[in-house]
């Protein structure tokens, strides 16, 4: 595995693979890798000839009161897992490498970002599409791999790829979970012992919502209340940031219960904000 830190070296390495007619699979991450990330790598390994992973904690997608400085980082750990997983290039740029000067232009997400994380984290998705536009141009992948846990981000990135004609196939991979159902996340390390024991209730609540919808329930308020009551059975969380249903991938109010629906939750613990979701009537690509 080659570790690359600057743009020019990355572009030259990618060009060499392209000249050899190799297909490129790309896994963008913010590091502190876990089994969820490595599942994305496994899919990339099977479906493409050459796998690139980036580890970059992107400052533009963090709000002023969020955990950019405290976000867990461990490059040695990441490099070890990436190499063991079959990554060919690990791109680990500095902030200055990706943002060498103040931006002269700004990307702004218009659709799919006004609710849930878009409402709760102002400017978050603008930062996501900004950094991915840069990284997509640098890596020039055939396939890019994302996890379903970040379903709203996936919908936003799909819009970016469609709007700006990126020749990239987005591959959406099912959320990887702990044995007790908690979605794998780099932020899980922030949980106290009691919080970690209780956090799987998020997934349990979302499954209740799925069961209600699949049994024919269309009273949205009732569905949300049942899920809220379930989460509140475990009192260690500080608050429920959101618990809602929307059409997917549009993120508009549900009007047709036979089409794509997302049930999404964000729950705040003392030092961690955890997200999870269930997709209904949606085929992963």
Swiss-Prot record:
Pathway: Cofactor biosynthesis; (R)-pantothenate biosynthesis; (R)-pantothenate from (R)-pantoate and beta-alanine: step 1/1. It catalyses: (R)-pantoate + beta-alanine + ATP = (R)-pantothenate + AMP + diphosphate + H(+). It is found in: Cytoplasm. SUPFAM superfamilies: Nucleotidylyl transferase. (R)-pantoate binds at residues 61, 153. The active site is at 37 (proton donor). One of its GO terms (biological process) is pantothenate biosynthetic process. GO terms for cellular component: cytosol. The keyword ATP-binding applies. Beta-alanine binds at residue 61. Its EC number is 6.3.2.1. It is an enzyme of class 6 (ligase). It comes from the Bacteria. Keywords: ATP-binding, Cytoplasm, Ligase, Nucleotide-binding, Pantothenate biosynthesis. GO terms for molecular function: ATP binding; pantoate-beta-alanine ligase activity. Catalyzes the condensation of pantoate with beta-alanine in an ATP-dependent reaction via a pantoyl-adenylate intermediate. Belongs to the pantothenate synthetase family. Homodimer. The reaction proceeds by a bi uni uni bi ping pong mechanism. This is Pantothenate synthetase. It comes from Listeria monocytogenes serotype 4b (strain CLIP80459). The gene is panC.
């Amino acid at each position: 595995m080659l570790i690359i830190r600057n743009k020019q070296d990355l572009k030259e390495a990618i060009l060499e693979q392209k000249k050899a007619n190799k297909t490129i699979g790309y896994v963008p991450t913010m590091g502190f890798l876990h089994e969820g990330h490595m599942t994305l790598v496994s899919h990339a390994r099977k479906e493409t000839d050459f796998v690139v992973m980036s580890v970059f904690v992107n400052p533009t997608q963090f709000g002023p009161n969020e955990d950019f400085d405290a976000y867990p980082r461990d490059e040695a750990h990441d490099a070890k897992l990436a190499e063991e997983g079959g990554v060919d290039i690990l791109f680990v740029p500095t902030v200055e490498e990706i943002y060498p000067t103040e931006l002269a232009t700004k990307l702004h997400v218009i659709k799919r970002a006004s609710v849930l994380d878009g409402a709760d984290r102002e400017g978050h998705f603008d930062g996501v599409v900004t950094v991915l536009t840069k990284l997509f141009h640098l890596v020039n992948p055939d396939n890019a791999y994302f996890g379903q846990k970040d379903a709203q981000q996936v919908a936003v990135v799909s819009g970016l790829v469609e709007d700006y004609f990126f020749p990239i196939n987005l591959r959406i991979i099912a959320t990887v979970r702990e044995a007790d159902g908690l979605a794998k996340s780099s932020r899980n390390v922030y949980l106290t012992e009691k919080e970690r024991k209780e956090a799987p209730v998020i997934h349990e609540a979302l499954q209740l919502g799925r069961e209600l919808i699949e049994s024919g329930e269309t009273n949205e308020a009732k569905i949300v209340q049942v899920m809220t009551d379930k989460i509140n059975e475990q009192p260690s969380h500080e608050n429920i940031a959101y618990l809602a249903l929307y059409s997917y991938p549009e993120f508009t109010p549900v009007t047709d219960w036979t089409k794509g629906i997302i049930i999404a939750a964000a729950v705040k613990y003392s030092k961690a904000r955890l997200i999870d979701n269930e997709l209904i009537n949606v085929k992963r690509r």
